[in-house]
Structure formats: C-alpha cells, structure tokens
C-alpha cells in the first residue's frame, strides 16, 4: 500500500552500494537512512535485518535479490539499491534491474581492496555506471593512519586502472557500524554532534556534489520500440509501443531502424493513447504512432522509431554477459564459440553467433564473461543496451552491449 503521494520537489538520483562481501555495504545503507531521517521527517529508517533479507525480483527472466531504500538530503531525493550476494550484483548490474547514476564503493580499511572490489569496479565500467564515490569503512579498526593512506592509494589506483578518475574521486573515511550504533542510541543525532555520524554526512555531501543529476529520459532523443503494428482504414499504419525516451508529436520526422536492410524516414501524422488523440507522447507513455506513407509491411515488431540520426542498426558487438546457472533455469552444460542462441533486444529475438575471446575455450553456467556476437539481422544498437539470451523461449543469460563493432 502506498504511503501517501510521491511529491516531486527535489531532483531524483539512483545510487547503490558496491564492493567486496562483508566490507559493510548493508550496514552503511542502514546508516544512511538513519542519519538522513534525523534531519528529514520524510525518510523512513531501515535496519540492517530489513535490508539484508532483500526480496526477490525478476528482471529479463532472471531472479535477483535486491533491497531498495530511499532517503533524501536538503538537495535531492535518492533511491538506493543494495544486494546481499555477489552473484546478485553481477545480475543486477548486467540486467540493469537497478540502474545507477552513481555508485558508493565500500572498502574495508582493515582489508583494503579485495577481488570483488575489483570485479565490481570493472562491472561498473562495463555497464556504464558513470560516477563512483568511495566510503572507506571500518577505519576504527586501523590504528596506523599511514595504513589508511595506503589503502586509499590502492583504491584510487584501482579506479584509475578501470578508467574512473581515481585521483579526483571523493574518498570518505568512517565507520558505518559506529554511526549506526550512535543512531540506535539517539535517533535524533544531528550533524555536528557525533564524529562518526558526521562521516556519513560527509558521504551524503559527496554524493550530492560529485554525482550529477542525470538527464531525464524525457529530455533524451526520441525512441520507441515497436511492439505491434496495425492499419487504420483511410488513415494509414500505426506502430504501438512504450516510449523509452524523449517525446513525439504530430509533424515530427522519425526513422524506422533495425531488421530491414535500409533505415527509412517518415513523418508522424498522429499520436494516440487509449484511442484518444494526444498532443505529445512522452517517455513512459504507451502510445500508437501514425506514420505517413508507410505500409503495414514496412514496419514490424522489433524495430524502433527514433529521432533521425540518434541510433543506427548494427550486427556485430561486444557484450558483458551473465550465464544463468542450472538452478536458475539456465543451461545444464557449457557452450563454445559458434553457439547460436536468440538475443532478445527490447521487443524481439534475433539469432546471433557467439565468438568467445582468445584463451576462453568454453563458458559454463554461472559465469560472467565478455564475448562478441554477430547477429543475422541488424538491430538498433547502442552501448549500454541490455538484452536477454534465450533458447526456445527460455532465458539462459543476460547481457549488456559494451562496444559496437560493425
């Protein structure tokens, strides 16, 4: 049941915690809600236990455990995701189930960067998480300040290795647990009253300042994946679908992109929603778009309508992929180069051939891998586009386009 209406007064930003197991991601997530709630009555506190038993979600046919919390600062409203397990992070980031405008990388000062620290930074780079802020946690467990400097240098180096600006990324040192314990003792602790709580404020300030407010979907170039096509006698051909981004109105020029050998231009002669005429369709709307001079045969499900020049059709790309385990309903066996499944982009399946990278003989269920795909038909592709890999209608993997080759 919804608790009151969501009033949009502040810009909205999606963030999440990433980092190695047991470095304190969930404790930090809980601390953020408590600290923000002390200064803002709209924020609901969430304790460690509530966040840790993250509910299951499904995204692109894959089950993922993700916890969502919300909090706000004086400047912005945040949605924050936290995942209990490492595999959940991989699945979450690859499916884009929880898109992040920026990530909070949690690193334990006692351990320094660990294998999953590296893996999550790499994933963030591949799936296009644009900004990272670092919270160096558990600093109360380290007596030597030089050791803290060393850990900070290591983290900055690691970020640089994966093309994040490691030298300018904010690194905040604190203890999520000590901050949370203080908030449990006194839930009204304000900024300036406790050194550990102040570290959480320092992190919130860094998120406010360093992670820019994203461009809203409605301000991006128009794109609508075509779901269905039909003819209105005497008026022409209508393509229906949900507008992914941008807006569209009568008189706009659009391109029909993908599946066909040629991209063709046409003009929008009508926009309708639930059989009513619409002045303008915007991102998120389910609409029918009437297209001038286009026959029923010239547009089909799986193509996209887009602002001219904003997206192009391609057949060959590189992708970062998560292959489902047998227990997740995936394949029971591995696959090799030459594997030919269906790639489900937006609204349609297209067959493609997989080429594994040099040195990788075989990919097993449960693996996270980067490989090249060549599709048998062109599809409107761009970096960051998510897809499912299917065999006979069941999902066996999920991926994201990391590089377009041709």
Curated annotation (Swiss-Prot):
Region G1: start-end pairs: 19-26
Residues noted as binding GTP in the record, renumbered to the chain: 19-26, 82-86, 137-140
Chain residue ranges for the region called G4: 137-140
Binding site for Mg(2+): 26
Entry GO CC: cytosol
Domain called tr-type G: residue spans: 10-215
Domain of life: Bacteria
Reaction(s) catalysed by this chain's protein: GTP + H2O = GDP + phosphate + H(+)
Entry keyword annotation includes Iron-sulfur: no
Family: Belongs to the TRAFAC class translation factor GTPase superfamily. Classic translation factor GTPase family. EF-Tu/EF-1A subfamily.
Subunit and interaction comment: Monomer.
Identification of the protein by name: Elongation factor Tu
Taxonomic lineage: Bacteria, Thermotogati, Deinococcota, Deinococci, Thermales
Gene: tuf1
